[in-house]
Amino acid sequence: MNKYPLLSLINSPDDLRLLSKDKLPQLCQELRSYLLESVSQSSGHLASGLGTVELTVALHYVFKTPFDQLLWDVGHQAYPHKILTGRRDKMSTIRQKGGLHPFPWREESEFDVLSVGHSSTSISAGLGIAIAAQKENLGRKTICVIGDGAITAGMAFEALNHAGSVHTDMLVILNDNEMSISENVGALNNHLARLLSGSIYSTLRESGKKILSGLPPIKEFVKKTEEHVKGFVSPVGTLFEQLGFNYIGPIDGHNIHELISTLKNMQSLSGPQFLHIKTKKGKGYAPAEKDPIGFHGVPKFDHKLGELPKSSTTPTYSQIFGSWLCEIAAQDEKLIGITPAMREGSGMVEFSQQFPQQYFDVAIAEQHAVTFAAGLAIAGYKPVVAIYSTFLQRAYDQLIHDVAIQNLPVLFAIDRAGIVGADGQTHQGAFDLSFMRCIPNLVIMTPSNENECRQMLYTGYKCGKPAAVRYPRGNAIGVKLEPLAELPLGKSKLIRQGKNIAILNFGTLLSEATKVAEDLDATVVDMRFVKPLDTQRIQEIAQTHSLIVTLEENAIQGGAGSAVAETLYQQQQKVSLLQLGLPDNFIPQGTQKEMLAELKLNAEGIFEQIKQFLQKI
């Protein structure tokens, strides 16, 4: 820590507040350098945190955290917060098994007020916390930091609308790092922001409204004057003013002294306050500034070279999906690809470039994405919604009400199904089979490799009804890709004929199941479809085997194994059943390999669980 003389002194925000203001620029420089060094050695989210260094320092310098409640939306930008709140020396463990959580996490620190991972939750939770503080007359401040992407979600505006109407003391800070809302940043804006956030202006404004409320012509003049003054700062402020907030900004989010002055002024204001700051994602590290998307989440890399390591030669499942999408779009101009702000992650970059008229990024709006797709389907188009398993949870009503009830041909390409690895509890794709399986009209497919994935996507595209294909994060296994052909709905595939024990596999754990089957001389069936289920195959297996093992990378409760159990009960089959899958708890972070081993879903673990079960029967 010799390279970081000031940062090494900061073990809590109390230490930070002992520094004089003139030391803060140096601290910010050290914090940014330390963040870059630590993340490059451990992997993690980089560009967002580089952009919030000054904001983080200013917030902890001005407010009495943890007494004052600081909430971070999503949490990608909270690494500097972790460093300043006693976790500096553990940053090398972030996102690793047993290490620091990748996002703010209540169980990890008293400074983490809200556990997060999904976007747009901070203002709703913050309002609840602020109202509780108001009821208890604690004098506690509530501050919510939200990005310009997250604030576009409907939930954020629902919360803003509510907060403005109840007029509770709280501060919402918009971290605008993509120039997507306003470009009005400069000395004049910073000066006016200090003026408008000051107590003199606030008092004059409120007093003037009361004094002149009975004089319509003068009242209107005061209102117009206020609007014109604010118009110098940012036209977008009108929107937040209409929602009931006192809007300040935009100001330079990398000017630590301007931030502190403005925050101190706003600290004394009552009612809902809104501060708009402009930052640069990847600030201070040229490669990240140039490519903030590429450096958003990074593996281990040499930050001195500034180059990220090249990925495996085997394509990812996301890339397999993206190439399939391009292949079909070239043949069918009515195919429409939809993503809720996950173009890169879902493998849709090439598609968006080759077929811009058939591509829609609807921003962080999962509910809208699904109902938008329903509308396209009604109009005769063939929408494909590319969405992570964990984010499909946010559009469950739309999946039922707007797609399934109307039996509309919408295809859901569900990425990151099963164990996702380092992002932990909030991002595991553990529940989609369970929450989809009970929905009428929906076809659900679980590919075991990339060729099966392509065939199932094509089957879903052609079947003329709601369909879902769920596939995991990471690289495919390298099988040969065959020409596209529709699969018969609800029909499984025999992989290996054995005796006594049958493993019914759902998804990409098939290779592990096959290894186990060799040792046990077990039958292996790739079930392919969770719905409709191949009940005929299950009946045949039950009549010729003494033990059926179901295998899936989904919660056991309500999952594919439960579907098999229900079928066996309905058929009144007398056969033992062992359901293997994800247990009834939230799965923490770790690599996919580590977590599958811990959950005993690798070959060794599956073998062990079967052997233990056999001893009981």
Curated annotation (Swiss-Prot):
InterPro entries for this protein: Dxylulose-5-P_synthase, THDP-binding, Transketo_C/PFOR_II, Transketolase-like_Pyr-bd, Transketolase_BS, Transketolase_C, Transketolase_CS
What the entry lists under Pfam families is as follows: DXP_synthase_N, Transket_pyr, Transketolase_C
- EC number annotated for this UniProt entry: 2.2.1.7
GO CC, any one term: cytosol
In which residues is Mg(2+) bound? 148, 177
Q: What is the enzyme's class at the highest EC level?
A: transferase
Give the reaction(s) catalysed. D-glyceraldehyde 3-phosphate + pyruvate + H(+) = 1-deoxy-D-xylulose 5-phosphate + CO2
Which cofactors does this protein require?
Mg(2+); thiamine diphosphate
A molecular function (GO) held by this record is:
thiamine pyrophosphate binding
- PANTHER family referenced in this protein's UniProt entry, alphabetically: 1-D-DEOXYXYLULOSE 5-PHOSPHATE SYNTHASE-RELATED (PTHR43322), 1-DEOXY-D-XYLULOSE-5-PHOSPHATE SYNTHASE, CHLOROPLASTIC (PTHR43322:SF5)
Which family, according to UniProt?
A: Belongs to the transketolase family. DXPS subfamily.
Q: What is this protein called?
A: 1-deoxy-D-xylulose-5-phosphate synthase
